[in-house]
Amino acid sequence: MDYNWLTVKAEARPAGEKGFGSFALQPIRAGETVAGFGGWVVDRVTLAEMPVYRQHRSIQIDEDLYLVSGETPEPGDMLNHSCEPNCGLLGSQLLVARRDIAPGEELTFDYAMCDASDYDEFRCFCGTPTCREVVSGSDWRDPAIQARYAGWFSSYLVRRIAALTAH
């Protein structure tokens, strides 16, 4: 049983030093849903008790809640970070193309759109001109990132950003 969904217009395959990634097989139009995340909802304490490989295949969906994928990696798990992503979040569980994506392009999103915890800090390999080099759970606080990804953040981060800017 698959817990995640990846569009038939893409496939998961090796992505160099990033491990695996998902790549467009056909043109994908801006606004198309490309992936859906599913699995088990766990709190931070439970997530911390899980094996590291399971932690890396999770997505933060609320203040202290994480969606953890199944035991076996699935194509929908193979979505990498980029500091110049072509996809963004719709709500907390759907990934949507932010722009048209050509065949062969890797589907990516900026983990700042969903992660606000330090459980998954890592060195970035995206190689884009605006690469932050290190991705952390506090990146969403950067006003430039907030402006760049307005409308593409997870629902709970939208609430956090609104609370910050209200003061």
How would you label these PLM feature ranges?
Residues M1-H167:
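Conserved catalytic SET/PR domain of SAM-dependent protein methyltransferases, capturing the structural core
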